[in-house]
Amino acid sequence: MIESKNQSFFPNRFDCVVVGAGHAGSEAAYISSKGGARTLLITMNLDTIGQMSCNPAIGGIAKGHMVREVDALGGIMGKMIDNTGIQFKMLNTSKGPSVWAPRAQAEKKEYQLKVKHTLEAEKNLSIRQDTVEELIIENDQVIGVRTGRGFEIFTDHVILTTGTFLSSLVHIGTYQNENGRMCEPTVKGLSKSLAKYNLKLGRLKTGTPPRIHKNSVDLSVLTIQEGDSNPSPFSFSTDKITRKQIPCFITYTNAETHKLIHENLNLSPMYSGQIQSTGPRYCPSIEDKVVRFADRERHQVFLEPEGYETSEIYLNGVSTSLPEEVQWKLVRSLKGLENAEIVRPGYAIEYDYVDPTELKPTLETKKIKGLYHAGQINGTTGYEEAAAQGLVAAYSVLHSLRNLTPLLFKRSESYIGVLIDDLVHKGVEDPYRMFTSRAEHRLLLRQDNADQRLMKYGYDLGLVDQKSYDCMKEKYERVNSVREKIYQIPLKPSDKFQNLLDQKGITNYKFGMKLDSFLKRPEIKIKDIEFMIPEVSSWSDLEKSILEMEIKYEGYIKRELETIQWKNKYLDLAIPEDINYEMIAGLKKEAIQKLKSHKPMTLEKASQISGVDPSDVDLILYHIKGKKKQEVEIF
């Protein structure tokens, strides 16, 4: 037990205490304090608030969707990256709009400082440098925390966002050290405190690649990767990205790299047995890539600059815990990196997490009232997943403080809802990462319409100001008004229209057909028909995109909304005891194994099994009803 100290000289009671100041903690502290709660943020190091521990980037497939959702709900991550990004790209634009996703490289140190300054400016937020070693619990209710220096802080709401710092262990070859990040101490007491109250703990592993010095790389022989010429912001409050963009570069592993890894596998903690924990399935180490995908001749490696004012380059795709001397050889086997100098070695890290099925959908623990978990403590990986959970936990605290009914995010309205639902109902077997494939209604959850879906919740809590909310409503009023107009405009002969037809090589059309039908042609974009709807010429690219998507995909969107209705109707549908899952065409092997093992009695129970995706549940439903999807009764 840590000895308590006289602490009458500073405030020791708060509405909410947030433990940890990574991406989950920063978002939680901001939302809690912005919502009027007197909040204390405790971090072991003020200089690492908002630090990017691994890759210097925000967003990506599904992750970018969540950043936009966090922004729509009043969070800060989108604004932070818009202000500190050094390269912006919209990913997957060659595919359907549901999987378009913004991603940006960050000026790593600038991002961290921007988060710190933003939190420091919050009037309801206090920040202290200390650790939390114990929870203070009475009658299954949290009443405070006890810090590493012996101070007691009292509160009815604690949000734990401990990242990789719970009883953590760093591995580089046979080298081990009790760090939460390289050269930063672990926290042991809190794990013991959680176990004391019968919360189920487990161990997970993650890793990071080496960083190299830019001046030691021959960039001239590498493939250059530029950002978008007209970058899309993350935040709905950002009009335009005007910052200077810098390129990334691409190289590849080769036969020499793979031979080197195979020869030294026995020195990898993951393969020597030194690490027993489960690592991220979808972000494997370079050792795992070479072993698991032995038929591949090469693996892509991205060289990502960490900022304008640093020479460090992040080697995306080369996460490793091999010994440092092997890392040097590995890096120097890559084209363009023959003389590369490693300034920070890659490493693996093991850490404690709490089984997220211990949580309610509010992220409050079921066993301890007032205790909330967010981020990697819940078995997730990624800055964006962490930020989303921090926001949800803080929303829940604000609803509790105001005696409001908790807000439960739905799978059908947000990726955040998918994330929380997966965690609390399915749990995790390896570090959880969000993908668009996890969302069964992803056409409704596009990155461009997050404000329409979610901003009302932030507005209701006072986290989104009146001006922003009014701007959002006016935007969609404009879109809806012009959309209705497009349904009524007939195609008429004109010089401009004939030029468009000639340019696109279109011959099969009819004058008199409505403009919406013409816009649904894959080769026609909204910009092509602006001369017929001149009011959109002054719109932002985002508004034009929303209008185009809603018209082009209106049939699919309508079908998706109907699907939600019939799914809700059949959630309680019983699964026959004698069902043969192997006879269901299209069902994944993993899903078959899990379903045979768990033997769920209803579709809802099947949907809550880890490894069973929404598409698998759809197939089971169609099989039970003995019909194809389009034949299943909707109403």
Curated annotation (Swiss-Prot):
It comes from the Bacteria. InterPro entries: FAD/NAD-bd_sf, GIDA_C_N, MnmG, MnmG-rel, MnmG-rel_CS, MnmG_C, MnmG_C_subdom, MnmG_C_subdom_sf. FAD binds at residues 20-25. Its main location: cytoplasm. Pfam families: GIDA (PF01134), GIDA_C_1st (PF21680), SAM_GIDA_C (PF13932). GO terms for cellular component: cytosol. GO terms for biological process: tRNA methylation; tRNA wobble uridine modification. SUPFAM superfamilies: FAD/NAD(P)-binding domain (SSF51905). GO terms for molecular function: flavin adenine dinucleotide binding. It is found in: Cytoplasm. Signal peptide: none annotated. The keyword Repressor does not apply. NAD(+) binds at residues 279-293. Keywords: Cytoplasm, FAD, Flavoprotein, NAD, tRNA processing. Its cofactor is FAD. NAD-binding protein involved in the addition of a carboxymethylaminomethyl (cmnm) group at the wobble position (U34) of certain tRNAs, forming tRNA-cmnm(5)s(2)U34. Belongs to the MnmG family. Homodimer. Heterotetramer of two MnmE and two MnmG subunits. PANTHER family: GLUCOSE INHIBITED DIVISION PROTEIN A (PTHR11806), PROTEIN MTO1 HOMOLOG, MITOCHONDRIAL (PTHR11806:SF0). HAMAP family: MnmG_GidA. This is tRNA uridine 5-carboxymethylaminomethyl modification enzyme MnmG. It comes from Leptospira interrogans serogroup Icterohaemorrhagiae serovar Lai (strain 56601). The gene is mnmG.
